[in-house]
């Protein structure tokens, strides 16, 4: 297919762009295969470049011969284009709708994008499983890398290489895979060097109504326990929901077969509930006519902050089991690709200082989301505005980033990255020139040959010139476990995501720049003080030597 076939009118003059908190801009609108571009005739610096893949929905209005297109983006932005001529407006709208809903992944922009920067580091090879394994293999000999899934035959949503107990052979793993949802047998998620406890994750056991068991599965997770120790199974579903899945062949671990494990049920909502929550929240944020009571009522009705609280509470429970009770844990929901990954990731941010650095967080995203099989292509296909909802869309990753922001806000000096880093990840998960978030799992990414045909997001982010934008000026390395508050008063709305297009950020940006300047000035003064102290010490040493006989 040629993109030209979808572009009925490639260029229109005298188009007026309207955006909140910006003056209207008149210019030329151009459509390419992947971008909507508006360039001002008066000022060449005034430009809009918008990826078609970032467009969630469009509305059309007509007043006489003037047409208006309202574009609603996946990053929650809303922009308005006034286009002279009804035919031109209809053609532009038709082209945008076609180009923003391309069926084939290989027609998306990452397959056509060519970087304008020098690639210093190939991000596709920055966080390989072998490298991650080396970080803790020196502290324990109880784990090994397994290549049982190298052809993706055992579990289509797992990577080719996984970490499992050394005492469990590959044949046993194949048997366990038939007992777990989607073949997702228990694998290592995190090793706590302080006490050797671990977090494992998996899909639900397929016990069904008959109470089916798998001795290899029991042996596998028991291999993570120390002598005389008990472990915890954290099921992210309520007991009622977990029991209902038994009728469909799913279920949970029976106490009789797992006597060394205590099962705890939490109530993190399934992914399809979350999409409706996001729609309600964004709708409330965009309505500027609310009085205070109405705003608070709509915010509460969205249940977004309730989801945040439930996820963070479960992550804190997991971290508490590991660090304070000295117990290993297994985490799963139903599929093991959504709430499971939210909890394992957040628990690591609480427990492990490395996950609070830029590269450590990138490694976490790579390991616990991309390689672990979170279906980004499905979950991020649409955002809060799309009219044609599919059952698999859900802001699971955005909820996770919101939880990270909540912890960052409570511990502003313990994270090497800033809020802009989290916002950038949200934007690229939904629309990007990079191939990192394409596909639903490693199997699909291999078939698409993303490493050969697209650029990794990490190749761009980890350039020194870009890193400075995402670095937290307040960062001071903190090697302690951090315990966030989950009290309702401690969990505000993330304005940087949900209100950034509805308010001017001018004064916030100026205040941030001033803070950075003050911190840099303090560092310069501290460096001068250190030099003067060193010189004073040298002078005192010389005086002492001269006075001695």
Curated annotation (Swiss-Prot):
GO molecular function terms listed in the Swiss-Prot or TrEMBL record: enzyme regulator activity; protein phosphatase binding
SUPFAM superfamilies hit by this protein: (Phosphotyrosine protein) phosphatases II (SSF52799), PH domain-like (SSF50729)
Superkingdom, taxonomy of origin: Eukaryota
Keywords recorded for this protein, A-Z: Acetylation, Cell membrane, Cell projection, Coiled coil, Cytoplasm, Endocytosis, Endoplasmic reticulum, Membrane, Phosphoprotein
Residue ranges that the Swiss-Prot or TrEMBL entry lists as coiled coil: 508-542
Subcellular compartments: Cytoplasm; Cell projection, Ruffle membrane; Cytoplasm, Perinuclear region; Endoplasmic reticulum
Distribution of this protein across tissues and organs: Expressed in many tissues.
Membrane topology category: Peripheral membrane protein
Primary localization class, coarse: cytoplasm
GO cellular component: cytoplasm; cytosol; endoplasmic reticulum; perinuclear region of cytoplasm; protein-containing complex; ruffle membrane
Record PTM N-acetylmethionine, positions in chain: 1
Record-annotated Myotubularin phosphatase domain positions: 123-498
Biological process (GO), any one: negative regulation of autophagy
InterPro entries: Myotubularin, Myotubularin-like_Pase_dom, PH-like_dom_sf, Prot-tyrosine_phosphatase-like
UniProt modified residues of type Phosphoserine: 548
Family assignment from sequence similarity: Belongs to the protein-tyrosine phosphatase family. Non-receptor class myotubularin subfamily.
Protein role: Acts as an adapter for myotubularin-related phosphatases. Increases lipid phosphatase MTMR6 catalytic activity, specifically towards phosphatidylinositol 3,5-bisphosphate and MTMR6 binding affinity for phosphorylated phosphatidylinositols. Positively regulates lipid phosphatase MTMR7 catalytic activity. Increases MTMR8 catalytic activity towards phosphatidylinositol 3-phosphate. The formation of the MTMR6-MTMR9 complex, stabilizes both MTMR6 and MTMR9 protein levels. Stabilizes MTMR8 protein levels.
Self-association state and partner proteins as the record states: Homodimer. Heterodimer (via C-terminus) with lipid phosphatase MTMR6 (via C-terminus). Heterodimer (via coiled coil domain) with lipid phosphatase MTMR7 (via C-terminus). Heterodimer with lipid phosphatase MTMR8.
Notes concerning its domains: The GRAM domain is required for cell membrane localization. The coiled coil domain mediates interaction with MTMR9.
Official protein name in the record: Myotubularin-related protein 9
The organism of origin for this protein: Homo sapiens (Human)
Lineage summary: Eukaryota, Metazoa, Chordata, Craniata, Vertebrata
């Amino acid at each position: 297919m040629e993109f030209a076939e979808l572009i009925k009118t490639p260029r229109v003059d005298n188009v007026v762009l309207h955006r909140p908190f910006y003056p209207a801009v008149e210019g030329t609108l151009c459509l390419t295969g992947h971008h909507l571009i508006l360039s001002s005739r008066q000022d060449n610096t005034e430009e809009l470049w918008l990826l078609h893949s970032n467009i969630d929905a469009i509305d059309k209005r007509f007043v006489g011969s003037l047409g208006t297109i309202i574009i609603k983006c996946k990053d929650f932005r809303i922009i308005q284009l006034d286009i002279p001529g009804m035919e031109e407006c209809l053609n532009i709208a038709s082209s945008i709708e076609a180009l923003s809903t391309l069926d084939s992944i290989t027609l998306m922009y990452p397959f056509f994008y060519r970087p304008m920067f020098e690639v210093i580091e190939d991000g596709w090879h920055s966080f390989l499983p072998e490298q991650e394994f080396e970080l803790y293999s020196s502290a324990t000999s109880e784990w090994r890398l397994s290549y049982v899934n190298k052809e993706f035959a055992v579990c289509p949503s797992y990577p080719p290489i996984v970490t499992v107990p050394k005492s469990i052979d590959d044949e046993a793993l194949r048997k366990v895979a038939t007992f777990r949802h989607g073949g997702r047998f228990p694998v290592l998620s995190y090793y706590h060097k302080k006490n050797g406890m671990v977090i494992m994750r998996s899909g639900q056991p397929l016990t069904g109504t008959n109470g089916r068991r798998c001795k290899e599965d029991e042996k596998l997770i028991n291999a993570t326990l120390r002598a005389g120790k008990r472990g915890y199974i954290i099921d992210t579903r309520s007991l009622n929901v977990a029991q209902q899945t038994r009728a469909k062949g799913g279920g949970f671990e029976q106490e009789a077969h797992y006597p060394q494990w205590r099962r705890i049920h939490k109530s993190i909502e399934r992914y399809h509930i979350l999409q409706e929550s996001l729609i309600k929240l964004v709708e409330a944020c965009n309505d500027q006519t609310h009085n205070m009571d109405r705003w608070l009522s709509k915010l509460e009705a969205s249940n977004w902050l309730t989801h945040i609280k439930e996820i963070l509470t479960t992550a804190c429970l997991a971290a508490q089991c590991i660090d304070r009770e000295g117990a290993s844990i297994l985490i799963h929901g139903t599929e093991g690709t959504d709430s499971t990954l939210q909890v394992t990731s957040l628990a690591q941010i609480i427990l492990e200082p490395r996950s609070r650095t830029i590269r450590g967080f990138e490694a976490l995203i790579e390991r616990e989301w991309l390689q672990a099989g979170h279906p980004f292509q499905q979950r991020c296909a649409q955002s809060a505005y799309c009219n044609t909802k599919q059952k698999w869309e859900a802001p699971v990753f955005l909820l996770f980033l919101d939880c990270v922001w909540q912890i960052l806000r409570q511990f502003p000096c313990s994270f090497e990255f800033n809020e802009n880093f989290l916002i950038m990840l949200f934007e690229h998960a939904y629309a990007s020139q990079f191939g990192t978030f394409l596909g639903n799992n490693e199997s699909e990414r291999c078939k698409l040959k993303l490493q050969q045909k697209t650029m990794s997001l990490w190749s761009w982010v980890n350039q020194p010139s870009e890193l400075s934008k995402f670095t937290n000026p307040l960062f001071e390395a903190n090697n302690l476990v951090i315990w966030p508050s989950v009290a309702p008063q401690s969990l505000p709305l993330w304005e940087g995501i949900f209100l950034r297009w509805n308010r001017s950020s001018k004064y916030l940006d100026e205040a941030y720049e001033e803070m950075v300047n003050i911190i840099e000035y303090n560092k310069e003064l501290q460096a001068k003080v250190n030099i003067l102290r060193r010189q004073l010490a040298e002078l005192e040493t010389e005086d002492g030597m001269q006075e001695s006989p």
